[in-house]
Amino acid sequence: RDAQESRGLGDVYKRQLYHSMIAPTIYNDVDGAYYGPDKKVHQADGWVNYSTFSLWDTYRAAHPLFTYTEPERVNDMIKSFIAFYEQNNRLPVWNFYGSETDMMIGYHAVPVIADAYLKGIGDFDAEKALNACVATANLDSYRGIGLYKELGYIPYNVTDHYNAENWSLSKTLEYAFDDYCIAEMAKKMGKQDIADTFYKRSRNYRNLYNPETSFMQPRDDKGRFIKGFKADDYTPHICESNGWQYFWSVQHDIDGLIDLVGGKNRFAEKLDSMFTYHPAADAELPLFSTGMIGQYAHGNEPSHHVIYLFNSIGFNERTQYYVAKVMNELYKNEPAGLCGNEDCGQMSAWYVFSAMGFYPVNPVSGKYEIGTPLFPEMQLHLTNGKTFTVLAPNVNKKNIYIQSTKVNGHPYDKTYITHEQIMSGATVEFEMGSTPKTIGVIFEEKRP
């Protein structure tokens, strides 16, 4: 890139890096005292207590980013979760100033805990952390969990007192992902019985798939799919999204989702349609559907990983195209420089990762799907004293397509890099070009 272009993009990057750190916030006095969710004063002894966890948003990229930029704080965040559980009988969902708002859904403290544990971060009590995860996931009275366990999904015709909007479909998918995270942590800890239980629960997303419509679809307590379903409608059954946008919320089992729809070719057609099926010109979109590319809504979190799913079916060049498009068009160095709500750092964390050339589709997998880098050189200085480097000497606004990849000087054909490669201080070098050249595993089916 020329110097002027690099300076401009550098300003945008620094802006997003700053924004990614606006939450969570320290929530204790200088002596460690803080007011807990049980309305009592507690003491953070030897650690810092944090609050303002917008976890439905930030588990996706912001918290994985913290594991590299500030792992010592991640340790204290997990300790904050454990303390919150001990004082409130469940992990935080969206806590603010020490109180639970229950503003969003899922039990997404779980993936943050699991990611930290699987990466070996900190000295938090893993037994206490896992127990808190399991207890929260088994709290039958909370937001449909009892029905989720009984039926394998949350029925749309049964509501609870937590939320006037049912969001049944979204809860089912979010719970399934969180259950996978519990299983991964339990497996690592040698607790196979817990792992088996939650791996089974993590497949509950399949119970909402309707092969007749090829979408996830709300079901009632008798097992019947809702009538009159339209995937581009925004309804009370789907959280801040429509059927197109939430269909892909199976980050833990993309291969299973591919099989569910009938194979890679069908999946490719559906994924391509996600970006090319545009809302009607007179459609009144909700305020959170911003940054639209077809049905893809970059202004809201459920879409954030979807761009990177082309890698899983051999269409890497489409991931590269759309990632570059979003970075160049939807992030700007101006007061209204985002296409949606910052959401406590998640919107910017997407950019911080993507500008480095990769993104955590599954935030607890230790794998980062390759997109397209933004700068000729980026370095990540790690707390273990090593430096992870990304090189793309000839990248510019036209040269957005990866022609070849090397890791530590050796040819590399995978569609992702790993946590271990990052922490080892590896050097990843991309040769960029202006025309697509698909890398990695390519299937032989007809392309849409």
Over which residues does each language-model region extend?
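Single conserved hydrophobic/aromatic residue that forms the stacking wall/gate
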Residues: 2-9, 13
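Short strand-turn-strand beta-turns centered on an Asx-Gly dipeptide
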Residues: 383, 407-410
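Short, solvent-exposed S/T- and G/P-enriched segments that are highly enriched in secreted/extracellular
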Residues: 413-418
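N-terminal core-entry segment
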Residues: 14-58, 62, 69-140
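Active-site core of glycosidic bond-cleaving carbohydrate-active enzymes
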Residues: 45-60, 68-69, 110, 120-389, ...
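C-terminal beta-strand-rich structural cap/linker in extracellular carbohydrate-active enzymes
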Residues: 419-448
